[in-house]
Amino acid sequence: MAIRTSDRIAGIPHYEPGLTMAEVMDAYGLSSVVKLASNESPFPPLPEVKAVIDAGLEGLNRYPDGAARALREALADRHAVDPGQIAVGNGSCELIVHAGTALLDPGTTVIHADPSFAMYPHLAAETGAEGVAVPLAPDGGHDLDAMAAAVDERTRLVIICNPNNPTGVYRSADEIERFLDLIPDDLAVLVDEAYYDFVAAPDRGRVSVLARTRPNLLVTRTFSKAYGLCGLRVGYGVGSEAWVRALDAVRQPFNTNQLAQVAALESLRH
């Protein structure tokens, strides 16, 4: 006899992970494969990062710092903000989920581009909200004017993937700032900068600076890609204290494990 589940999950497609490299080699009789599907770094973490991970193994009988204080302080120093303006999560994906939980209700909407990161539509389904998918501009980037035009009184969250996954098109900080000027200043905007480290534009990094003066803006980043820490799951967000309080209100008490915290902290030193 099946269990009775929430009506909300009926429309959520089950995530089907790709085959592991071992499964692909076994299925096709290969001796090696090059995996590109998940945008993972082909390089392992730095030796210094491996060393702090090894040292941290002795303390696995203890809970991690639930507030990730050392990591928050280091990230706050890097971004020239107060530690209360930094949120730390089990990957930046968790912070995006927390944003949906904290902001969305049935009858509200979340606006995102299409195609973009496949996780965004799930936020609406998981919370009973409605997802508004705005087609990309002809250049493959976010059509920010169209996204602004899609905002109405039901909109609670706008997500901008910058550079966009999967097209790789980057919107400048000036374009993001112009978009912020077009929408209500109390409408939450999350800029997902998972691929920030691969941007060559001269204004790279300035979007996170906007978060110092735009209380409705949260910028998320991850240690998975450039730092090679996919397997440890650690990411962070820079935003107003109001944004961070909202995210902290819905997170688990010990959401970022100890090894992830020390590995991320050491990664910032290199």
Where in this protein do the model-derived segments appear?
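N-terminal small-domain helix-loop-helix segment of the aminotransferase-like
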Residues: 2-93, 98
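PLP-dependent aminotransferase-like
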Residues: 102-160
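Short acidic capping loops at alpha-helix termini that bridge into adjacent secondary structure
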Residues: 32, 82-86, 106-109, 154, ...
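Short conserved AdoMet
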Residues: 29, 58, 104-105, 152, ...
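Active-site pre-lysine segment of PLP-dependent enzymes
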Residues: 125, 142-154, 166-189, 193-226
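Short beta-strands and strand-loop turn motifs
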Residues: 35-37, 131-135, 157-163, 189-193
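PLP-dependent aminotransferase class I/II
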Residues: 67, 216-270
